[in-house]
Amino acid sequence: HLILASALICALVVCTFAEEQVNVPFLPDEREVKCIGWQEYCRGNLPCCDDCVMCECNIMGQNCRCNHPRITSECGSRR
């Protein structure tokens, strides 16, 4: 059972990693948004998108997409 569970976990990890590698075409204006990872709230200790509160990027921090426009100036241009 342990071997079967390990194989299942490995398959899941491989599938998840392969899914991350898919390049989804974004609109040109969305492609310019830069951020690292996914964050819901901008804090001083997290990378923050200039124009977004929530951003989604691929594993390399590129092809970022803004999901929610910034409503307040909470984010500013913090890096």
Curated annotation (Swiss-Prot):
Functional summary from the UniProt entry: Potent toxin that may paralyze and/or kill insect pests such as H.virescens (lepidoptera), S.exigua (beet armyworm) and M.sexta (tobacco hornworm).
UniProt name for this protein: U1-plectoxin-Pt1c
GO molecular function: ion channel inhibitor activity; toxin activity
Keyword NADP: no
Signal peptide: 1-18
Disulfide bond positions: C35-C49, C42-C55, C48-C66, C52-C75, C57-C64
Propeptide: 19-31, 78-79
Compartment list: Secreted
Entry keyword set: Disulfide bond, Knottin, Neurotoxin, Secreted, Signal, Toxin
